[in-house]
C-alpha cells in the first residue's frame, strides 16, 4: 500500500543553494521533515543550474519522509536571463526594457514545455510572449 500523504509544500529556491534558513527551514519544520536531508538532496539534484530559481513541490508522508519534484524555472526568470536584465519594466506599456527574438521565445518555450499547459510549441510560445509583454519586453 502507498504511504499516506500529509501535505504538499511548494517553494521557489535558487538551484544548488538550499539551506535550512527561512523560508525552507520553517516550511519543512512544521511538517517534521529532516531539513538537512532535503537541502542535500535538492542541492545535489540541481547543481547543474546553479543559482537559477527552481520551483519545487515537496510531498510529505505520514512517516515524515518526503519526495520532491523540481519544475522548470519560471518564464519570467528565463526571459530575464535571455536578455541579461535584472528586472522587468515597472510600467510595461510605456517603458520597454529589451527585445526578445522569436528564436529566443521558441527556445524558452521548448524549455518550459513540460510544465506548461500547452498542446503545441506554438501555443507555448504565445504564453511566453504574453509573459514577456507583461514584463515590458518587446517581441521582434
Swiss-Prot record:
Coiled-coil annotated spans: none
Post-translational modification summary for this protein: One or more lysine residues are methylated.
Gene Ontology MF, one: structural constituent of ribosome
Transmembrane segments: none
A single Gene Ontology CC term: cytosolic large ribosomal subunit
CDD domains, A to Z: Ribosomal_L11
Keywords: Methylation, Ribonucleoprotein, Ribosomal protein, RNA-binding, rRNA-binding
Family under the similarity heading: Belongs to the universal ribosomal protein uL11 family.
NCBIfam families: L11_bact
Function: Forms part of the ribosomal stalk which helps the ribosome interact with GTP-bound translation factors.
Protein name in the entry: Large ribosomal subunit protein uL11
Source species: Geotalea uraniireducens (strain Rf4)
Taxonomic lineage from the root: Bacteria, Pseudomonadati, Thermodesulfobacteriota, Desulfuromonadia, Geobacterales
